[in-house]
Amino acid sequence: MRAFQVVEFASPIVPRDIPDPQPRASDVLVEVASCGLCHTDVHLQQGYISLGGDRKLPVSMTGLHTPATLGHEIFGHIMAFGPSSGLTAADVGRPVIVYPWIGCGHCAACLADRDNECPMPQSLGWQRPGGHGERVLVRDAKFLIDAEGLNSDAGIYACCGLTGYAALNKIVRRDGPIGIIGVGGVGLMALSIAKAMSLGPIVAMDIDAAKLMLARQSYGAELSFDTRSGNVGEQIQQATGGLIGVVDFVGAQQTVDLAVSVLRTGGTYVNVGLFGGALQTPLAILAQRQLVLRGSYVGTPAELRELVALARGGRLRAIPIQNEPMDSINEGLTRLRAGKVTGRIVHTHRQVTATQG
């Protein structure tokens, strides 16, 4: 099969012919139709995650080694399976979304269906080959979400959607305005999900005027603010009286400082972004204002199933999708790295076209 692989960090991804994976035991082989492109792919391809300043975490320390097949927003069809998978011939060809955040299968987190908290992750597109290959091996059928009736862009729910849904679930209070920092693909999806969950009013924050306009006019954000404004925190406080929750999809120094400054007493800050910020709020302030600080990393298999149910029920507004061939993966990474993508890029493998449900 053909796979698009990182052979050398910070260099273009290369198409290579590699052996087809063979399912054994409980394995399921999925033929990949499409795979969404994520900022995590940008970090992994460059070879490090920024920790702020000059500090960097090499991705080799997280279990990714070259040659690596990235891609974790996977939509495909069941192709083959191992003898203890629990599947039958009737399942072959069934459309599925793949939950990629697979754990070791043995620790307390995995046994409690919280694979995303596993200390020894085996995530597809990271520690294990992902959807930038034409076929992907999934350890167990429980990580396959039925996608009947959904179109082939639905793989984005496995990260772009799940990341926002799980982060919103971590906000403690639900009785006031909620801020979303960064309204790119994940932020717009989170906005759509927040509306489906009857949260809000929603305050959108970004540095891109076009994205803010889209968030307000098409996705229901009641207010929007350009975070480059020198007094944006004061503007938000005056307009809302403070926010009960902020989800930060950027994670830069400026965004964490802004988020903490606009929270009400008892508010929740949820950080998702990986752009190198550091928390510098005095501990006395945390205590006096009774703030809740949470990190959020994707979500559980159960949360993905809940999210897909929302989508199937027609309660989510689709985000802008740019369907492109997998051969253009490097161009997509360049645009995403430069912040030139509104919504999501979804790459399709050769001889595979987007299917409508």
Regions found by a protein language model. Give the residues of each.
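N-terminal glycine-rich cofactor-binding segment
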Residues: Q5-Q22, H39-A80, D115-Q127
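Glycine-rich beta-strand-centered segment in the early N-terminal region that forms part
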Residues: P21-C35, S50-H106, I145-G149
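Residues in the short beta-alpha loop(s) of Rossmann-like NAD(P)-binding domains
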Residues: Y48, D208, F275, G299
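NAD(P)H dinucleotide-binding glycine-rich loop of Rossmann-like/cofactor-binding domains
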Residues: P58-H72, W101-I181
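Mid-domain Rossmann-like dinucleotide-binding core that forms the NAD(H)/NADP(H) cofactor-binding site
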Residues: V92-P95, E134, E148-S229, E234
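Glycine- and other small-residue-rich loops at beta-strand/loop junctions that grip anionic moieties
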Residues: Y99, Y157, I180-V183, A204-M205, ...
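Glycine-rich cofactor phosphate-binding loops and adjacent beta1-alpha1 units
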Residues: K170-D175, L212-V292, T353-G357
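C-terminal hydrophobic helical "lid"/dimerization subdomain
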Residues: D257, P301-G357
